[in-house]
Design a protein with these regions (language model features):
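Flexible loop/turn segments at secondary-structure boundaries
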Residues: 327-330, 349-352, 400-405
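N-terminal nucleotide-handling cores and adjacent loading/scaffold lobes of large enzymes
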Residues: 1-174
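Structural motif
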Residues: 339-341, 392
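Interfaces and regulatory segments of ATP-dependent nucleotide/adenylate/phosphodiester-chemistry enzymes
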Residues: 93-315, 408-506
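Beta-rich nucleic-acid/ligand-interaction surfaces
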Residues: 321-335
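Conserved catalytic cores of phosphodiester-cleaving nucleases, focusing on short active-site segments
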Residues: 312, 332-334, 341-347
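C-terminal catalytic or substrate-handling cores of phosphate/nucleotide-
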Residues: 382, 390-425
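Catalytic cores of nucleic-acid endonucleases
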Residues: 347-397
């Protein structure tokens, strides 16, 4: 088409997609995905930016092709991965016209649909189908909610560094980061966040080093190299990784066969910053002897509890830490007006093979059984042991990938806890908002509670997301993360951004 005579067709097999992507240089695909990821990112992933119309005239026969395209940036990983696996930098089209790349995305969507249809054949229950669909939606949600990234990053740094010091943690995060990466944690964040900021303007990763400023006496180039080496992957690494397309969420910087170090998607660079320190520490302990592997998971759970307690104190909520017994109970009992609220915190983070549109639903099911089933049992036990009449029972998940709407499907399984319509799943941002609402506007808080109960007992399709329920009732405020307790981390990120030439010139 046009001057680029490429073959497009229906994708009905892996071989079809292999033949298709071989027409393009891997470098050409990486250049095009980066360019389009910038456009979509700056638009806030708006529906207007995702919908395109392609009109292309075939130079050979004069035939005009009309094609509507829905850009799905979460599928860039699939196209890049398959391109690296099946092609290379030296064969195929390098400089793709915009319309050609959009048509390549259409073929990628066809391929994903083909693979999805095969996977769906393995789903044997409504619960399995729900897990598969919520896994699919979880990755998409991450792309569509840029603002949550900053909150998650700042909150997590506060828990790992400030709360760990305050409550004398056995984990010394500064030492672990230095040992694993060879740089101090602030320099790690400085480089990763700096690369993300610079990738909004340049594809070459090495461009970012010009805009980074370290403490006096530090070797800027050496620090930058250590961090980028840790988070980079060449084509052989990508091809041989058992992570598949998920490797770009772990190693987002791509070493091309033409000696470039490139950003493939602005989103990959953003995502790697968000939980970078957490994963360095977690992986450090996973490589320890078996009896030490759980150390960080357990300790992070304790620090997460302290974080929540600070939240309750800040908003003067009447709370009680539920006494521990031999049979495990929930963590917290809140009394807000005439409402009793039980909260069970879960700090587990889902494996990376779950966090994709073609989710490993068997692994997801296993994690749900391990996390949600256990939490439901703890909440029911606490309700009975403490003789609490009709409490609101909330499972607070640190990992916001577990969708609140999954809960009714859990009860559809053969599960001993009876669904009384008072169980909910929430993430930490939602609980911050929920607590603030209870403290500042009790009448609206009551309306939200009643709406929660109504939606949980009537299958009306409105959903059980606490965030959506609050927003639907006119509440959209989370002031807690703007508290001065987070200033050290907010200022660190602000300084990095403000030093970049683009923002300096504003």
């Amino acid at each position: 088409m046009s001057q680029q005579h490429l073959k497009f067709g229906i994708i009905t097999s892996e071989n079809d997609f292999c033949s298709f992507v071989k027409q393009f240089s891997s470098l050409g695909i990486i250049k095009s995905t980066y360019k389009l990821s910038k456009e979509v990112y700056f638009s806030g992933c708006s529906i207007e930016s995702l919908q395109r119309h392609v009109t292309e005239k075939d130079a050979r026969n004069g035939q005009v092709l009309e094609q509507d395209v829905l850009i799905q940036p979460w599928q860039f990983a699939d196209l890049i991965y398959k391109s690296v696996v099946y092609s290379n930098d030296y064969k195929g089209v390098i400089d793709l016209k915009d319309n050609m790349f959009l048509l390549a995305l259409v073929e990628t969507n066809e391929y994903i649909s083909f693979v999805t249809s095969d996977l769906i054949k393995e789903l044997h229950s409504g619960f399995d189908i729900s897990l598969f669909m919520y896994g699919f939606g979880g990755e998409q949600f991450k792309y569509e909610t840029q603002f949550i990234f900053f909150q998650n990053l700042i909150r997590e740094l506060y828990i790992i560094f400030t709360i760990s010091k305050k409550y004398k943690s056995v984990i010394i995060p500064e030492e672990i980061v230095k040992q694993e990466i060879g740089v101090e944690w602030k320099d790690l964040v400085l480089v990763l966040f700096g690369i993300f900021i610079d990738s909004l303007f340049h594809q070459d990763i090495n461009e970012a080093v010009r805009y980074l400023t370290f403490d006096s006496g530090k070797n800027k180039e050496e620090i930058f190299k250590k961090v980028t080496e840790y988070y980079s992957a060449d084509y052989d690494t990508i091809r041989n990784s058992n992570l598949g397309r998920q490797i770009f969420y772990v190693k987002p910087y791509i070493k091309t066969q033409r000696n470039g170090l490139l950003t493939a998607s602005v989103y990959f660079n953003q995502f790697i910053v968000e939980h970078s320190v957490f994963w360095i520490i977690r992986n450090y302990y996973l490589n320890k002897p078996k009896n030490e592997r759980q150390t960080f998971t357990d300790e992070f759970g304790r620090l997460f509890e302290h974080y929540l307690e600070e939240l309750f104190i800040s908003y003067k909520v009447n709370y009680e830490k539920v006494p521990e017994e031999k049979e495990k109970r929930a963590d917290w009992h809140l009394t807000i007006g005439h409402y009793n609220i039980l909260i069970e915190q879960k700090s587990a983070v889902l494996p990376i093979n779950i966090k994709q549109q073609l989710t490993d639903f068997k692994a997801y099911k296993k994690e749900v059984h391990k996390t949600i089933h256990k939490a439901l049992t703890q909440l029911e036990t606490t309700e009975k042991d403490l003789h609490i009449d009709k409490p609101i029972k909330i499972i607070l998940c640190y990992d916001n990938y577990i969708d609140a709407n999954i809960l009714p499907h859990v009860f559809e399984e053969d599960f001993p806890v009876v669904n009384d319509g008072r169980y909910f799943v929430a993430n930490i941002m939602e609980i911050e908002m929920f607590t603030e609402l209870a403290s500042t506007n009790f009448s609206l808080f009551e309306i939200v509670i009643e709406d929660m109960l109504r939606r949980n007992t009537k299958d009306n399709g409105e959903g059980l997301s606490l965030l959506k329920i609050m927003r639907d009732n006119g509440y959209n405020k989370d002031s807690y993360w703007t508290s001065p307790i987070f200033d050290e981390y907010k200022n660190l990120l602000k300084d990095i951004k403000d030093r970049h030439k683009f923002f300096k010139d504003k």
